[in-house]
Every structure is written in C-alpha cells, then in structure tokens.
Design a protein with these regions (language model features):
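Ferredoxin-reductase
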Residues: 1-32
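Gly/Ser/Thr-enriched, mixed-charge loops and adjacent short helices
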Residues: 25-162
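Conserved phosphate-binding catalytic cores of ATP/NTP-utilizing and phosphoryl-transfer enzymes
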Residues: 1-10, 149-169, 257-265
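Accessory "access/gating" subregions that flank catalytic or transport cores
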Residues: 106, 122, 158-174, 181-186
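Short Gly/Thr/Asp-enriched flexible loops that form oxyanion-binding sites at enzyme active sites
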Residues: 24-32, 179-198, 234
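Phosphate-binding and adjacent anionic-ligand microenvironments
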Residues: 164, 168-170, 174, 190-193, ...
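Glycine-rich phosphate-binding loop plus the immediately following alpha-helix
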Residues: 30-60, 198-222, 226-237, 292, ...
Length: 322
C-alpha cells in the first residue's frame, strides 16, 4: 500500500500467506491509491482476467531475465525508510517509550514482521525486545503452528511460554503478512491475558482521542472508521470525544476507501484512526490498509504512557468498560 503510493504505481499485487494454513496463498490487488480494490474495481479486473485465453493468453518472462533486463526491480531501502518515517510521525507522545523501561516479547509467527516491527520499536526507544526464536525467521511452512493467526491462542503458545521466563510487560504477535497484531499482558495471577481486537481497537481509539485533545493535536471535525461488525463501544467513545464514527462493510478496503474520500476533499488529516475486530488497525492516512507495524508502535506507546502514570493495560481496559 505504501510502495504503490510512494512510487506512483498504477497498481500493486501482494502474494501472501496471511494467517492461513501453509498450503494456501492469498492474492491481494491494490489500486493506484494504495487501497485494496473495492467491489466495482475488482469486477472490472475480473472481467479482463476472464477474457484472457486460458492457454497461451498470458505473456511470460523468466524471472532472472526480467531482473537482467530491468523489467523487474527490487524496492530499495530508501522506500522502506520513508515508510518507517511516516509510521513514526503518527506518535502522540514521542518521548514516552524511551523512558518507560517497557519490556516486550515479540513473535512474527515465521512471517514478514520481524524486520519492520523491530525497526519501528527501536526507532521509538523500545530497547528490551525479545523475539521468540523458533518463530523469528520467515518460513512459509509455518512449522510451529498450523494456523499462524494471532487471534488463535494456540498460535501464541511459544510466545506465552517465553513470557513465563522473560516476564515482559507486553506480548506482541503479528500475522505472517504483518497487517494484524495481537497482544497479551500480565494478569493479576501472573498468567498472561489475551485482549480481543475489539478491546485493543477501542482502547487505541480512546487513547488517541484523549491524548490528541490534551496536546492540542486533534484536527477539526475528526473522523474514525470501523467495520460494522466491530464493537459499538467505539461508537460511544467517538461520541464522547466529538469524533465522527463511520461504520463500513467488513474488509479494510472499505476503511481505506473512506480515507480516499477525505483525501479527495483535501481533508485527509481529519482521519485519526481505523480498525476492525480481527486485529487490524491504522493510525494516519499514509497508507490505505491495516498495518501491524503502526499497530505495534501505537500499542507499545499506549502501554508505555499508561505505565508512566501508574496504570496497566489491564486496568486501562477495565476503566474503559466502566
């Protein structure tokens, strides 16, 4: 989503394992706006695909030959660094993580999150990060769990076991294509408590609203967006802070579509947060898709901020429900 926009591409394709069993791959198609294609655009593309003869209709090129000819180019590091710059700009309290002493256990579940998540945490000052060793390196066979989905407790087994010895303040787990992130925090009995996507989404919304208002960083007529199946608590939080909540169909592309509407009106800065209950979060309009890199950053910042005022994430969750 970022690279399509940054490089001025007409479209983008992601072949992804996502959170599915290893025998499956996903295929995500993005438009020039960096948003996954909505129904209308997808129908047009599908009609073009169906018109291509099954045998011999597609022109093929050898991958190595494509590299040699310059037809295929790898994204350079400056594109990645520019992306991380934009993520980092979405911080609300930039100083809080470096002074918090926050301790994190992280697992990318053998997916793609290892480098970007650790890079952003290092940038914001979270220095005590322990990665689950068996799940650190990319492996499309996902040998440690049949379903590498952070929504499923079994996928977090190794991370939770490591928590018993490291005793972190926070466990982060990103799915293989690093667009969703799950968390667990220490409970009162010493065991780690998993939060739902609805809970994290609502807590992030409340944190963003409260702290942006306190710091004078809230835009005029702010907008948040969530899927219609996500918690109604977020609607109440938005109402309390004077934020317009837009509810859209399931699928983050519809949240991205709303950001596009705001951008077309010259009002992209009105967008403050978007989420869906399946652990997908986005703060800022720099991309048009859910992003576990900024999700991880904001969760760590929120945890560090509450820690700085003597409140745990468990206590913050309880206060939200009250």
């Amino acid at each position: 989503s970022w690279a399509v926009r940054a490089l001025g591409c007409k479209a983008g394709i992601v072949c992804t394992a996502s959170h599915n069993p290893s025998k499956y791959n996903g295929y995500k198609a993005y438009g020039a706006d960096g948003c996954q294609m909505t129904i209308e655009a997808a129908d047009i593309v599908l009609s073009k695909i169906n018109a291509v003869p099954m045998f011999g209709g597609a022109k093929l090129v050898d991958f190595d030959e494509g590299i040699k000819s310059g037809m295929i180019e790898f994204i350079k590091q400056d594109v990645i660094e520019a992306y991380l710059d934009e993520v980092q700009k979405q911080q609300i309290h930039p100083e809080v993580c470096a002074t918090s002493g926050l301790k994190v256990v992280y697992t990318p579940l053998n997916g793609t999150g290892n480098k970007p998540v650790r890079a952003i945490l290092k940038r914001i000052g979270v220095s005590e990060v322990t990665v689950v060793p068996e799940q650190e390196m990319p492996d499309g066979h996902f040998p440690t769990c049949p379903f590498p989905n952070p929504e499923i407790k079994e996928a977090l087994h190794l991370g939770l076991e490591l928590c018993k010895t490291v005793k972190p303040d926070l466990l982060l787990a990103t799915d293989p294509d690093c667009d969703r992130v799950g968390i667990a925090v220490p409970g009162k009995d010493g065991n780690y408590v998993l939060f739902s996507g609805n809970e994290v989404g609502a807590m992030l919304l409340e944190y963003i609203c409260k702290e942006r208002i306190a710091l004078g960083k809230m835009p005029k007529n702010p907008v948040a967006v969530k899927s219609i199946v996500s918690t109604a608590i977020a609607d109440e939080i938005a109402k309390d802070y004077g934020v317009e909540m837009r509810n859209v169909l399931t699928g983050f592309k519809f949240i991205g579509e709303q950001i596009g509407y705001l951008e077309a009106a010259g009002e992209a800065d009105r967008f403050i947060f978007g989420f869906e209950e399946s652990y997908g979060y986005l703060g800022g309009s720099y991309v048009r898709d859910k992003d576990a890199v900024i999700g991880s950053m904001l969760i760590c910042e929120m945890a560090a901020y509450y820690r700085s005022i003597g409140v745990s994430l468990l206590e913050a969750r309880e206060a939200m429900y009250k």
